Amino acid sequence: MKSAIRFSVMGLALALAVSGCGGTKSETSDGETVTVPAGTPPIWSLTGLPGPDNAQIQPIVVVKIENDPIVRPQTGLDRADLIFEELVEGGMTRFAVVYQSDLPDEVGPVRSVRHVDVAIAEPIADAFVFSGGARRTMKFVKRKIPTSISIVNEGAPGMYRKPGIPAPHDIFLKMSEMLDSIAPKNTLSTGFFVRPEVKPVVESASPSASSSASASPKPSSTALTGKPVTQVGVKFSSFSGPNWKWNAADKMWMRSEGIKPFLNKDGTQFGTNNLMIIEVREIDAGYKGSTGGYVPRTVLTGSGRAWVLSNGRATEVAWRKPFVNAQMELTDTSGNPFTMP
């Protein structure tokens, strides 16, 4: 049996850590009390891992981060609960990075928003951070993102240009400064997936692919029914095609760009416990890039196939996300709800 799989995809990668239920009462920073459904232990909304009593009212922050080779290693990727990788112009990819349980001091480089980021942020975000965007995309953001989500652009508290780095790669986010400037959270957060949700991280692909990073895996019988796999390649374009290799000792999928390890800021190789590769549609964004080239638009609504990679195995599932503001549902090939490991 072959132990390597290559998926040809066109534009989205997702990394996710999932949630569970809540229980107990917690206070927000402005003193308002939020009631968490009783009878459930405190967990982080995105990872489903044990957390403090107020875990589910901690803010969820979605940040758009650049992935041009010249900016690697980026700052803060290894601290994320969830990472989406998506195709942009020029055949390159960028990340929509989601934080809650582990907030880094600094994140970046921060770059511009795309339509697909709205479908990522709207169901879960309290703060949506990006440098700016094309006029058509910004109109979509303003139409779809509710006022309950704080939109943070260049010039907002916490956003700054780092000296010594050429524009446009120099915009970074100081997380605590930004969070201090937005309205306090007073509602319970939800995960990206409809319960039962993912426990570790996910990666998606299709005509668009996804990559993910998450907390330590708790194997599920569903995930373990998949085919043994030791390597996976996700081809976004002729320019971008990350590879993931299963490290059985660390129980992690380790990322490389070609044969070159994809590194964290501290020099270690980036890895995740679980990946989910999702098939999605890619269409023309309807505007040109800064150099006049084609700009792809990844469509993260509708339904399609996906592959969950966990514990050295790959399992085919189906995904469904009927609206931009809807959570994503996962089912197995028999139509039963799929539980991430």
Q: PLM features: residue spans?
A:
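Bacterial N-terminal signal peptides that target proteins for export
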Residues: 1-8
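Alpha-helical transmembrane segments
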Residues: 11-15
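C-terminal motif of bacterial Sec signal peptides marking the signal peptidase cleavage site
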Residues: 17-20
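Bacterial signal peptide processing site
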Residues: 22-25
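A surface/extracellular/periplasmic glyco- and lipid-processing/surface-interacting theme
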Residues: 31-80, 89-341
